[in-house]
Swiss-Prot record:
It catalyses: RNA(n) + a ribonucleoside 5'-triphosphate = RNA(n+1) + diphosphate. Its EC number is 2.7.7.6. Disulfide bonds: none annotated. Its main location: cytoplasm. Keywords: Cytoplasm, DNA-directed RNA polymerase, Nucleotidyltransferase, Transcription, Transferase. It is found in: Cytoplasm. Belongs to the archaeal Rpo3/eukaryotic RPB3 RNA polymerase subunit family. This is DNA-directed RNA polymerase subunit Rpo3.
């Protein structure tokens, strides 16, 4: 049975244990989060004036990398075919001063820069910058600007520490200081590595013998971080629904071919 246990959740990241799946599924989830979950990003820019020190292409690239809020209630983000919808972000600025992401005017109030203080370009006195930037939905597999964030996973393991070691108490205290769950019996201390646990150099001679690591089958520690376009929990939910839709499409195609 597949189980998910949330270990830690903040505004921009989530850490959870995923249990009961193969490494192939864990990697598929990771790849789907990075490459398939869609977000809005600037894809085309039309310049009318640019007296700044930067070429049009450089400004366009900077605009493309600004994270844009992506409303989950208006778009079917788990669909295999994306909605063809364009948002216009316009700007008319004159120096002296710095142009920030918050200066962009969106024709859709739900799609706007995540943070207003990302610098775009510095204008000297008399310099002007006028453009329309067009944002659309896209996927990270086509360009990194559409990635909703970052994710990685590791095998969930247990480190067994024998009490025959002189100074085993130090390792137990170190694990607790790191916030790692520990269990103890008469013979050993067991540390659950929900995050990395590094053995001090003075204990290296015991590794593989009195200190050994057990890999828990089909169990992984996932960390997902968001750029701000989507709530972090929505990124995981959308990725799982996309995987389900792809599996359903594959099964339907097999059934069709089987006649």
């Amino acid at each position: 049975m597949v189980k998910i246990k949330i270990l830690k959740k903040t505004e921009d990241s989530i850490t959870f244990i995923l249990e009961g799946v193969s490494v192939a599924f864990a990697n598929a989830l990771r790849r789907t989060i990075l490459g398939e979950v869609p977000t809005f990003a600037v894809d085309e820019v039309e310049f009318y004036e640019n007296d700044s020190a930067l070429f049009d292409e450089i400004i366009a690239h900077r605009l493309a990398m600004i994270p844009l809020k992506t409303p989950t209630d208006r778009f079917e983000l788990d669909a295999l075919e994306l909605d063809d919808y364009t948002v216009t972000l316009s700007l008319e600025a004159e120096g002296p001063g710095i142009v920030y992401s918050g200066d962009l005017k969106s024709d859709d109030p739900d799609v706007k820069p995540v943070t207003p203080d990302i610098p775009i370009v510095k204008l000297a006195k008399g310099q002007r910058l006028v453009f329309n930037a067009y944002a659309k939905l896209g996927r990270g597999k086509d360009h990194a600007k559409w990635q909703p964030g970052f994710t990685y996973y590791k095998y969930f393991t247990r480190v067994h520490i024998s009490k025959k070691i002189n100074g085993w108490e130090k390792l137990a205290k170190l694990a607790k200081k790191r916030g790692l769950p520990t269990k103890e019996n008469e013979e050993e201390v067991i540390v659950e590595t929900i995050k990395p646990f590094y053995i001090p150099k003075e204990f290296e001679e015991y590794e593989g013998k009195e200190i050994w690591e057990e890999i828990v089958p089909d169990t992984y520690v996932f960390v997902v971080e968001t750029n701000g376009e989507l709530p972090v929990e929505e990124i995981v939910k959308i990725a799982l629904r996309i995987l389900m839709r792809k599996a359903d499409r594959f099964i339907n195609e097999l059934q069709r071919l089987a006649g």
